[in-house]
Amino acid sequence: MARVTVEDCIDKVDNRFELVLLAGHRARQISQGAQITVDRDNDKNPVVALREIAEETLSPADLKEDLIHSLQKHVEVDEPEMASEFITHSSESESIFNTSSQEEGTSFDHMSEEELLAGIEGLVVPEKSDDY
């Protein structure tokens, strides 16, 4: 195959734009020292990449997966939740401070309506300023 055209590769990769992305990615791999799978024949890296795709020496699905992986900046890994670790830490803190979370959650100060009104009447209104 003296000349490689998009028509030679389009039956392997359906989308022309995806073909260009895959060939460009493979050409970068070749320029970084990756082993080529076809004869170079004094061709440049993009042509060699297209020839590899056309002759199916490389799987387009593998190239696509490698391209996606190379473009990812942050790979999120699903980790198991640490609910049991939180439970052990909270029980440790209860033993250290000799308190339980139930006692802290149920203690409220009770105030009658008269005490609340007396507290509100005792508030001083701040002077109005031109700051705002």
From Swiss-Prot:
Please identify the protein, giving its name as recorded: DNA-directed RNA polymerase subunit omega
Protein species of origin: Bartonella tribocorum (strain CIP 105476 / IBS 506)
Give a GO biological-process term: DNA-templated transcription
Role noted for this protein: Promotes RNA polymerase assembly. Latches the N- and C-terminal regions of the beta' subunit thereby facilitating its interaction with the beta and alpha subunits.
UniProt keyword list: DNA-directed RNA polymerase, Nucleotidyltransferase, Transcription, Transferase
Its subunit composition reads:
The RNAP catalytic core consists of 2 alpha, 1 beta, 1 beta' and 1 omega subunit. When a sigma factor is associated with the core the holoenzyme is formed, which can initiate transcription.
Question: Under the cellular component aspect of Gene Ontology, which terms does the record hold?
Answer: DNA-directed RNA polymerase complex
Which E.C. number(s) belong to this protein? 2.7.7.6
UniProt enzyme class: transferase
Bias kind Polar residues: ranges: 96-105
Molecular-function annotations in GO: DNA binding; DNA-directed RNA polymerase activity
Location of region: Disordered: 89-109
Family membership, please give it.
Answer: Belongs to the RNA polymerase subunit omega family.
Which reactions are catalysed by this chain? Answer: RNA(n) + a ribonucleoside 5'-triphosphate = RNA(n+1) + diphosphate
